[in-house]
């Protein structure tokens, strides 16, 4: 690991500081990586709608993905799965709730309905197969098929919006290609990847140390500190959209991040584990049901009313707090961990 001192208290303090450093590196590295990825896509003359629908969406999910991959390689399935599932629950129960409470917003029922259906379908697939205690290759393939459909539908939706604004799918974006811009973006790309990888390693290793020191499980710290930490970019985007009175921007960002977290991260981890991704009872009987309940409250009333309401946001936030308390009490009673 990263700690060499023999003093237990010093170990915990240093581990906590390294954990925070890991989060900072992940967040800043993610920013650099997204900026550089978009620049590269523009240099290759990718249509603007395709950049937004694919490159940005996948790039912003990289921090969660790297954290889960490192965890599964190290054999810590609790953090690997807990990070992915916990990030989706945190995005919905905390970040989306905040957006609904302070801004709300009318939604496009057709566009939102497709994404809502994919979130619920993905959650049900995860829940059903995780009850067996393992998440194997077959459900992973199902989720990847959902990912392919989601990326296609998102690209087509963005293309329709682009054409409505009298832009063509072949629009070429003017982008700086001078030597300084090339060097700057190459450095951003390298630093971004390095920041995410190093930050993820620090986060995974030191979260385990902190968890053991304060007497909680890897699973609990995964759905709280790790999941919320890797969801900070979405939180920042949402707060920015609230300040700018553009609630729909935050909602779109959250929904997209949730789908990709569910249908991309866990299948990759399952393939790495050769179909032997072990699922703790805590995840199967508390985390995933909580995800489904919170997601249902987020999407069903929204589809009916065509908007997010303040009351809905408050209910979602209360459910999320109740879930965290239940997870903690379950761990204290040694029911699942």
Report residues per predicted region.
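Hydrophobic alpha-helical segments, chiefly the membrane-spanning helices
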Residues: 1-337
